[in-house]
From Swiss-Prot:
Keyword S-adenosyl-L-methionine: no
MF term (GO), any: superoxide dismutase activity
Family of the protein in this entry: Belongs to the iron/manganese superoxide dismutase family.
Disulphide bond pairs: none
Biological role: Destroys superoxide anion radicals which are normally produced within the cells and which are toxic to biological systems.
EC number: 1.15.1.1
Protein name: Superoxide dismutase [Fe-Zn]
Lineage of source species: Bacteria, Bacillati, Actinomycetota, Actinomycetes, Kitasatosporales
Amino acid sequence: ATYTLPEPPYDYAAL
């Protein structure tokens, strides 16, 4: 993902 999110698996939510 290309957004600043918490640790994975949240990275997939950064669509």
